[in-house]
């Protein structure tokens, strides 16, 4: 199902098939793109393991902190490959609090290899800092790489779930308080059905708990 199909399905569901429309194609497109991102996070739908720009970070000797790609929100596997090494070494994702309790002096400790990593909202910190240049190797769940713009564009999530994206667009459309189409009952129903299908959005406490589940062999979530 492409963007053109989704907009048409939205208009049928919203009783908005007669010009002049209550909502422009531009607004509906914006809501549908929001829906793809929401679905990806709630359902953990887009697992990335191969794209170098997301899954590989060049690391330098002595430098501990590196930015993550902005679409990556949950890491499922993390390792460090020193240049010239035969195989990468898997890292554990932990919190700074865990390191304070279990590895006193970790901020200044020097070891012969990287052991842990601390993930923040947009970066990864290697502990200790790499003793040699290398590569940070990542796998994890991500947001869509691009938004739909033209009518032929297709959502990145599986085609089986495309029609459910309309539910989020309906929720947004009927939630506009200054619109003649404002309908809180239909908005609530649409949001409830979307949540029933894709799951709830993780709140900040859950994201932190998941990111710092100690130590748990690289499983984290950020937004």
Where are these regions (language model features)?
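Glycine-enriched, solvent-exposed interface loops adjoining structured elements
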Residues: 1-223
């Amino acid at each position: 199902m492409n963007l053109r199909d989704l907009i048409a399905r939205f208009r049928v569901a919203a009783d908005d098939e007669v010009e002049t429309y209550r909502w422009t194609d531009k607004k509906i497109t914006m809501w549908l793109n929001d829906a793809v991102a929401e679905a990806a996070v709630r359902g953990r739908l887009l697992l990335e393991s191969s794209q170098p720009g997301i899954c590989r970070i060049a690391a330098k000797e002595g430098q501990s902190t590196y930015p993550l790609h902005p679409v990556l929100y949950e890491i499922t596997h993390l390792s460090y490959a020193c240049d010239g090494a035969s195989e990468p070494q898997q890292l554990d994702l932990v919190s700074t609090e865990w390191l304070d309790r279990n590895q006193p002096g970790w901020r200044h400790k020097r070891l012969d290899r990287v052991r842990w990593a601390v993930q923040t909202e947009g970066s990864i910190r290697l502990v200790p800092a790499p003793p040699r240049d290398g590569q940070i190797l990542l796998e994890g769940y991500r947001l869509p790489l691009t938004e739909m713009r033209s009518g032929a564009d297709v959502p990145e999530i599986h085609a089986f779930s495309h029609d459910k994206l309309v539910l989020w667009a309906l929720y947004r459309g009927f939630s506009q308080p200054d619109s003649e189409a404002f309908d809180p009952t239909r908005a609530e129903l649409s949001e409830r059905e979307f949540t029933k299908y894709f799951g709830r959005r993780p709140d900040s406490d859950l994201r932190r708990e998941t990111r710092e589940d100690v130590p748990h062999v690289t499983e984290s979530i950020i937004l």
